[in-house]
């Protein structure tokens, strides 16, 4: 990311996680086991493809850990996928409205994109007729 964006950076590692830190900007990327990641609470979170990559059984732990990393009224943007899981399964996994609301009741759905053109080949091959990206915004409760 940093090299592609031509942003000077440094790398630090504590043996568990690697931290890529921009030299002249307040921007860092942490790589490693998400459940071992600890930091001061963040003002915001943007989840473009993490929740949909987590198997259903781990999602409650993912949501709790994410919440533990946020300030009380942190801004939250989440993008989920919706499709017929009886025809194809993830990853990326479908995450439906009831599940999002169970984890973060304060989020509201603000838009969606019927992204058939962006559908991964395995879903297209399964004959899915709908593949929706849903956009959620808000502050977690």
Predicted regions and their residues:
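Class I (Rossmann-like) S-adenosyl-L-methionine-dependent methyltransferase catalytic domain
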Residues: 1-38, 63-141
